[in-house]
């Protein structure tokens, strides 16, 4: 059993917003499918850390989730900044059940145990100290990450965020402080 991660797939089977119009994205869906199914087994778990689909609603999301559901492994998905279709966990789980997307689980204020590891996470946020809206969003995301960590049942935890808390030119102390308090170790990839 292995745990993999990917983000920013920006699938668009149900909407007209193909990413392969950008340099380096040519046939990206085919490359994702080929490499995913070459590396991932049905016993593995793949965390999809946001920006999953360009869909604006569940109706346009169906084809993207069909694609994801048909890939090997179990999938745990969390929200990215472009997941406009994202809704309450209850509504998303109803959507998943209605369409039989049983390999997909929603990571939202919760965690999942994979073997002896708890998978935790939230979207996170890049914080601009001068923007009141950013402060509200950041506080909400820190709260969501706390709920995810609080729900973890295993001693070992892996945290996934759509927005990395450290970039080349900034860091998000609020998220980093929470991870430090909870003794989440940095892993080299």
Per-region residue spans from a language model:
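Short glycine-rich loop/turn motifs that provide flexible caps or phosphate-binding loops at active sites
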Residues: 6, 49, 79, 120-123
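Short, hydrophobic/glycine-enriched beta-strand segments
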Residues: 2-8
